[in-house]
Amino acid sequence: MAGPVRGLPGQARHPVVDVHTHVVPKGWPDLGAACGGSGWPWLRIDSERAAMIMVGETEFRPVGAQCWDPAVRLADMADDGVDVQVVSPTPVFFSYDRPADQAVKVARIFNDLTLEVTAGGTGRLVPFCQVPLQDPDAACAELDRCLAAGHAGVEIGNHVGDRDLDDAGIVTFLQHCAEVGAPVFVHPWDMPGGPRLDRWMARWLTGMPAETHLSVLALILGGVFDRVPRSLRICFAHGGGSFPFWLGRADNAWHRRGDLVRGASSAPPSAYVDRFCVDSVVFDPAALRLLVETMGEDRVLVGSDYPYPLGERPVGDVVRRSDFLTDGQRDKLLSANALHFLGASMYTSRR
């Protein structure tokens, strides 16, 4: 189990489930040779413990052994007092902009390699898969294959090209997730571009929150939550982006400009906050208070974005530092809500 928790002095020990971590497995083949096409990501190995994700000849992101070595992950989990990690793909590998047959092959490669990483996690690393979301039938088939192989759920991006999460094909996939009991983690992946966003990591600091906000609105105003079963378990990364802060604005627009805003929804956006979860990656107790008050104490799950540099370390720090939380609420955020989100799939994946 996890080691000592870095929290407030005298604070009770709570189990911790981190629903937002990423993996970059080693050993993937030349994707151009394996899947066709060009300009694929590849891994430049710089040392035994360091590498660089390359896209073509462009450096995309430095990564370390935490991304592929379960022993390193478990050591970090012990330092942070984390009992379980949900291990999801790194979105650069989603390949939604590729032909579907290529995306199917890429998904299979990374999903199988992810299982090799999590197999070394002594049952504490819970794998989520990726799917070729641009092809609903192929996405459903790959999800089924992965669930049978030991994955506990699926991570998807927030859109496919110009298709948001209310797209008919994506809704078909979400309905399938509800039917088979697969939890869905939504992570932004393709952010707005242009020179104004090339400074200060602005794509990550402004683009990602805006993209997630839009994907939540697509599910609400696109009428998806009115069509898919309530059994769908879906969680949005990064605290739901800017959606929680601007929920009042969305409600106001729904009432005052319903001709433009209501779309296929049957109620204002605030009526749907019990249909989805968000993680706790907001870093500040005041922001977490807003998140809990807006979403409800049952709808916020600890996430960290481990092992990337914009993630939270130690994991769950903002939850432990937030003195407005009762002990019972803290327990919900640190683990109980995540266990409900994961459901039986977590235990199936850890057999």
Where are these regions (language model features)?
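Mid-to-C-terminal alpha-helical segments outside catalytic/metal-binding sites
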Residues: 1-15, 19, 26-84, 112-120, ...
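Short catalytic/ligand-binding loop motif for oxyanion handling, primarily in non-cytosolic enzymes
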Residues: 24-28, 85-87, 93-97, 136-138, ...
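Aromatic- and acidic-residue-enriched segments that line the glycan-binding/catalytic groove
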Residues: 28-42, 101-104, 170, 250-257
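Divalent metal-dependent hydrolysis catalytic cores, especially in the metallo-beta-lactamase
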Residues: 54-65, 74-97, 124-132, 152-156
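Surface-exposed, active-site-proximal loop segments in enzymatic domains
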Residues: 90-106, 137, 199-202
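Charged helix-capping and loop-helix junction motifs
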Residues: 102-110, 166-173
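Short glycine-enriched loops at secondary-structure junctions
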Residues: 133, 188-192, 306-308
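Catalytic pocket-lining loop regions of alpha/beta-barrel enzymes
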Residues: 143-295, 299
